[in-house]
């Protein structure tokens, strides 16, 4: 599975988290892992193996653990917006990309931003990609 596919699954897990409380989410996440929805771009043979599931679970847990800090960083640069007022797609992508920018040294900032923008084009509204790009650009400038 490519990094892009893992990133998309991470986004989907974070997006899913927005709809469930802390008691319900673990069960829903397990269901997702048992039968992940693959995109039309994904080769059907590229099924999620155990190592990928483990990596994905660790990554989602690490991001979830840092949500208050990630939201604080996003809120500091999102003029006129707070994460609690943003769309679920946008906030999930912003959290993922902010995590990658701040904590994942293997992913260049430009790659994190570009991938978030591409996912915003795919899953968000017409304005999502520019919204995500603008906030992440400000975040990188201010750090």
Label for each model-derived stretch:
Residues 1-129, 133-143:
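N-terminal interaction/assembly modules
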